[in-house]
Design a protein with these regions (language model features):
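Non-catalytic, soluble scaffold/interaction modules
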Residues: 1-202
């Protein structure tokens, strides 16, 4: 089989295929009552604290493995996560529309990401994927799902996935992962940028 694509990071890689399928996030479909609003907001606060802690751990790993420029990606993610317009948008949907906090997060993230995805500049379009990465992490923490990641892989492999978030790429063991193939993303994605930094074909 011959598959044609766009190179995100130049090189040749040989290894076993590791198909990475992300666990789907199922958005709960229920409204909250007035007396449940405070608890929903509390879920958001707890998930945010966990998200920031995880992002800081990834930032530290990226700093050691790749350098300050790549670590700065996750510093930016932490800043985006703490943007008042993001948290205010989520809280407003919970308080005024009585949406559960996971559904409110999904809608707010989609709105924010769509702004970037609709831009003409390829680099800015890719930032929409970064926002979705932050939102996915928040929702996974709200739902008690294990953080996704690729740090557990063993053997020499080529990762095949629909897409890889920056946090996915930062968790890779460069001694194990020899190449990356994704259906989405491009040369300006943070995943491609980090693949180039660690010298892996993508």
């Amino acid at each position: 089989m011959r598959i044609q694509g766009i190179s995100g990071s130049r090189g040749v890689a040989v290894g076993n295929v590791y198909k990475y399928i992300q666990e789907e996030i199922v958005i709960p479909d229920y409204e909250v009552t007035d007396d449940q609003v405070e608890a929903e907001i509390g879920k958001f606060a707890s998930a945010m604290a966990a998200t920031l802690k995880q992002l800081d751990t990834i930032r530290q790993k990226a700093l050691v493995d790749m350098g300050a420029d790549e670590a700065a990606i996750f510093e930016a993610h932490m800043q985006i996560a703490q943007d008042p317009s993001l948290s205010d948008g989520i809280k407003s949907l919970v308080e005024n529309s009585k949406m559960n906090v996971v559904a409110a997060t999904a809608q707010t993230i989609e709105t924010f990401a769509a702004i970037f995805i609709g831009m003409d500049d390829p680099y800015m379009r890719e930032r929409g994927a970064d926002i979705k990465d932050i939102g996915d992490r928040l929702m996974r923490n709200m739902l008690g799902m294990n953080p996704r990641g690729l740090s557990h892989i063993s053997g020499e492999v080529i990762i095949v996935a629909h897409d890889l978030a920056p946090s996915d790429t930062a968790s890779l063991d460069k001694n194990v992962v020899k190449g990356i193939v994704t259906a989405a993303g491009g040369p300006t994605s943070h995943a491609a940028i980090m693949a180039r930094k660690i010298g892996r074909a993508s």
